[in-house]
Every structure is written in structure tokens, then in C-alpha cells.
């Protein structure tokens, strides 16, 4: 039987395992040094943020997490688009390969949607990978239309 829940620090190792599986699938294999650095950062990040401004929802079967999604809550100055000043960013939606296409990830996302409503979030946003796009559309997510184009700036990393 599948159990859906909001995780806590007792599941830290399983959360990190799923995050690393997601990263490997999404971006390919990493060097052992990069994997170790990511895992170390995740340990610290989750210890400081889990169930504060980062929530991890999961599906569990036989005490093993089989599907997971992160919700990052961001508080910012309000405007007409987000009058409560709080929005949610869904990320790292991942289901183990043998459990895909069974509605499990959809149920995990529904948990986040219900939770977000109780937190008075103005909206939830996510970046949809091609595999997840039809699911998010089915759940009611819409393509974001904005007069502003999303941009980013990256610093060059120097190897010391």
C-alpha cells in the first residue's frame, strides 16, 4: 500500500537518495567529487530548511520513498500578482522508474497543492520537463505568461 505524506528529518537519507537519482537522470552522471559536494550541501540545507521554507512531500511503499517533490516557499514584497507576498516553487519531482505512469507523482503534487492552499500561497510555479508537462496540465497548471522574460546570470567558477 502506498502512503502519501510530508517528510521530516527522519527520512533525510531517503530524500537525498531520491534527489541524487533525480540529478543523475536529469543531468547525467557526476564526478564522485561533485556528488559528494551536492550530498554534503543537501544534508546541511535540509537540516536548516526542511519544514520551515522547504517542504518535501513523498509517496512511500514498504517504508521506502518511491516518489518525491520539493516545495520551496518564498516570501517577498506583495504586488497585484501575489497580494499575500508568498509563492511556492515546486521542484525535483521524481518517481522511481518502476513506479512511473501509475498516478503516484500526481498524488504527490496534489498533496503540495492542498498544502499550498492552507499556507495562503498566491500561486505555485514549476519548470516542467517534457515527461512531466502532460501531468501538470492535467492537474490544472497553465503555461506561465509574463511580460517579463526569465533571465539568469552565472559567475564563472574558478578552481583554486
Regions found by a protein language model. Name each.
Residues 3-17:
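A short beta-loop-alpha structural element at the N-terminal edge
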Residues 44-58:
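A short helix-loop-beta-strand connector motif used in the catalytic cores of GNAT acetyltransferases and
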Residues 58, 64-73, 89, 94:
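Conserved beta-strand in the GNAT
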Residues 73-79, 125-127, 131, 137, ...:
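Conserved catalytic-core motifs of GNAT/GCN5-like acyltransferases
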Residues 81-97, 149:
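Conserved acetyl-CoA binding element of GNAT-fold acetyltransferases
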Residues 109, 116-128:
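Conserved GNAT acetyl-CoA-binding A-motif
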